[in-house]
UniProtKB/Swiss-Prot annotation:
The keyword Membrane does not apply. Keywords: ATP-binding, Nucleotide-binding, Translocase, Transport. This is Uncharacterized ABC transporter ATP-binding protein YvcR. It is an enzyme of class 7 (translocase). GO terms for biological process: transmembrane transport. The lineage of its organism: Bacteria, Bacillati, Bacillota, Bacilli, Bacillales. ATP binds at residues 42-49. PROSITE patterns: ABC_TRANSPORTER_2. The gene is yvcR.
Length: 259
């Protein structure tokens, strides 16, 4: 079963005079099955951010089709789209996007509170998730009282607690040191393995990408190639670097820490 399906997805930005100024994404096809962990990589300006914005439903395609969990977002009205985004999607951002005025517990529970889930169920979900991610000891802390890595793990918990169809992770390790980054990627991999979370990760970091099961490479707004991971993450990491070298662009954009 495909959780995500795009067909001929394109995004063109126009000038004020109506002439084409930039073709950000061109005829892009992508299928993501339930329980997959897929990475998106490419040089700056390749179309990664545009693709993510379209999938997040904060921008609309110029043409093409996109279906998430059997629903076409473009057919939804504004209020329906906001509800769809809240229930079907989970987000993990580079800068965490946790609210400083709330505790870690309250931040994680926010999606359930907005949906008016019963308190007993909220606490049960949180208890299980906090156990899995080993963050029980920070639940009653404020965001500024915990490390960046702990904040991002809390953000991962918030992204999945409402059981979304798809989690979109945008450079989730971008603001972290290598140790914290590895912990966060282990967290996402754990959610994928144990909770069968379907995750789409956009990253420049080859090490972060090596935690995925499949990498799709974009160049100039178009599909370039894809590679699949076997049993050895180190071999997959090297395959990612090899593909990036063929892909071109500024190779120094890509963080090449060894896994």
């Amino acid at each position: 079963m495909n959780v995500l399906q795009t067909t001929n997805l394109s995004k063109t930005y126009y000038s004020n005079k109506g002439t084409i100024s930039y073709q950000a994404l061109s005829a892009f096809d992508l299928s993501v099955s339930k329980g997959e962990f897929v990475g998106i990589m490419g040089p700056s300006g390749s179309g990664k951010t545009t693709l993510l914005n379209l999938l997040a439903t904060i921008d609309k395609p110029t043409q093409g089709e996109m279906m998430i969990n059997g629903i076409q977002p473009k057919t939804l009205k504004d209020q329906e789209l906001a509800l769809f985004r809240r229930r079907e999607l989970g987000f993990v951002f580079q800068d965490f996007n946790l609210l400083d005025t709330l505790t870690i517990r309250e931040n994680i529970l926010l999606p359930l509170a907005l949906d008016k889930v019963k308190l007993r169920e909220m606490e049960a979900r949180l208890d299980e998730l906090a156990d899995t991610l080993q963050i029980k000891h920070i639940l009653d802390h404020r965001t500024y009282e915990v490390s960046g890595g702990q904040q991002q793990r809390a953000a991962c918990a918030r992204a999945i607690i409402h059981n979304p169809a798809l989690i979109l992770a945008d450079e989730p390790t971008g603001n972290l040191d290598s140790k914290s980054a590895k912990q966060v990627m282990n967290t996402l991999a754990q959610l994928n393995e144990e909770k069968e979370a379907t995750i789409l990760l956009v990253t420049h970091d080859a090490t972060a990408a090596s935690f995925c099961k499949r990498i799709v490479f974009i160049k100039d707004g178009r599909f370039f190639s894809e590679i699949h991971r076997g049993t050895n993450r180190q071999v997959f990491y090297q395959s990612i670097l090899d593909t990036l070298s063929v892909l071109g662009g500024d190779f120094h954009e890509f963080e090449n820490y060894r896994p």
